[in-house]
Swiss-Prot record:
Family note: Belongs to the GST superfamily.
Domain GST C-terminal: 82-215
Gene Ontology biological process terms, A to Z: glutathione metabolic process
Name of protein: S-crystallin 4
Length: 215
């Protein structure tokens, strides 16, 4: 097995899905958290001048958070078991990522850094907030129905085994639910799924000991 280094800011953000996959698999990795003050001097050294970035054996670099997550999910057994199931895990995960991405863009500064603060919530542009809200309105009903397609939505998205898709349901909605506890009020299956992820033995252990960050 290769050695892994995950490069990202000291946030959950777009890297948390990878941290959850490492935790679910019980695989050790170097969680390299970069302070915002360091980013200016490091940016040009990163693929596409962006993070997160996953590094294997200190030589292979994988950018793009969902490409990283899919790689780890396949490596660790948290993806689909055949091509159709993999497509299902992918489109569910990418749908949750759309919500996460639109939410985070409300709080980006011009250099791509998060400027999230409870006292500055209203500084997010109305256009970006409207886009985020519309994304939620489009995607939540679809994901609720998609979850119900397997065992009435009473287990995980792929049945009785947790996958990347379920972890994305949890991590993509952490901060949105802090802002608005009612966003899943009309989607009880999704809310119950998040609780199953929280109570999954590996996830529960990880969530209790992980670093506490604002976003």
């Amino acid at each position: 097995m290769p050695s892994y280094t995950l490069h990202y800011f000291n946030h959950r953000g777009r890297a948390e899905i990878c941290r959850m996959l490492f935790a679910a698999a019980g695989v050790q990795y170097n969680d390299r958290r970069i302070e915002s003050s360091e980013w200016g001097s490091m940016r040009s050294k990163m693929p596409c001048s962006m993070m997160p970035m996953l590094e294997l054996d200190n030589k292979i670099q994988i950018p793009q958070s969902m490409a990283m997550a899919r790689y780890l999910a396949r490596e660790f057994g948290f993806h689909g078991k055949n091509n159709m199931d993999m497509a299902r895990v992918d489109y569910i995960s990418d749908s949750f990522y759309d919500i996460l991405d639109d939410y985070m863009r409300m709080y980006h500064d011009k250099d791509g850094r998060m400027m999230f603060s409870r006292s500055k919530d209203m500084n997010s542009s109305s256009e970006k907030r409207m886009r985020y809200q519309e994304t939620c309105r489009r995607i939540f009903p679809y994901l609720e129905k998609t979850l119900e397609m397997r065992n009435g939505g009473n287990q995980f998205f792929m049945g009785d085994q947790i996958t990347m898709a379920d972890m994305m349901c949890f991590c993509a909605l952490e901060n949105p639910l802090m802002e608005d506890q009612n966003i899943l009020r009309s989607y009880p299956k999704l809310q119950a799924l998040r609780n199953r992820v929280i109570n999954h033995p590996k996830m529960s252990a990880y969530l209790q000991k992980r670093s506490r960050t604002e976003f």
